């Protein structure tokens, strides 16, 4: 299992925390839109609260990279902000947009993000679940690489 991050300080914190658990996780410095892995390297890719920090262009590049490194039949699982389920959730998400930027978060709150996943070649794109939080709607997405 690999953990990837573009910030060496974050990787050091992760390494330190996981060393106490004697885990078999390899932490790799790299960026999601230029994954340092060969084609068909993984059966599953998981992302948590990362995509809403990326511009639409980098979201697209990242999704294409994930598609590239997944084996046929591989799965993508994403936990990130989703389409606001009601006016209260839309208002709550405004604080996230102020902090993280409107440019990078609009695809999520408006519900465009699943279509970006499809455009990268993924099939069976689903919103598996959603949760209302004090900051907005958190969605759990899944998708598959068929070929």
Residue ranges and their predicted role:
Residues 22-24, 73, 122-124:
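A generic structural signal for alpha->beta connector loops
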Residues 1-34:
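Class I SAM-dependent methyltransferase SAM/SAH-binding core
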Residues 60-72:
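A short glycine-rich, Lys/Arg-flanked "PGG" loop and its adjoining helix->strand segment in the class I
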Residues 33-45:
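A short acidic, Gly/Pro-enriched loop at the edge of an enzyme's catalytic core
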Residues 140-147:
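C-terminal lobe and adjacent flexible extensions of AdoMet/dcAdoMet transferase-like proteins
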Residues 44-57:
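A short SAM/SAH-binding and catalytic strip from SAM-dependent methyltransferases
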Residues 77-120, 124-139:
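C-terminal alpha-helical "lid/dimerization" subdomain adjacent to the S-adenosyl-L-methionine
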């Amino acid at each position: 299992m690999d953990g990837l991050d573009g910030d060496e300080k974050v990787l050091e914190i992760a390494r330190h925390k996981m060393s106490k658990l004697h885990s078999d996780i390899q932490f790799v410095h790299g960026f999601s839109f230029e994954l340092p892995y060969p084609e068909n390297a993984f059966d599953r890719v998981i992302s948590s609260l990362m995509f809403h920090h990326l511009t639409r262009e980098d979201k697209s590049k990242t999704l294409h990279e994930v598609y590239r490194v997944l084996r046929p039949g591989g799965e993508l699982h994403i936990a990130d902000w989703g389409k606001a389920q009601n006016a209260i959730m839309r208002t709550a998400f405004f604080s996230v947009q102020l902090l993280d930027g409107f440019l990078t978060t609009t695809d999520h709150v408006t519900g465009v993000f699943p279509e970006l996943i499809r455009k990268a070649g993924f099939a069976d794109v689903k919103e598996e679940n959603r949760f209302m939080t004090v900051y907005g709607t958190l969605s759990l997405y899944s998708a598959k690489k068929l070929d």
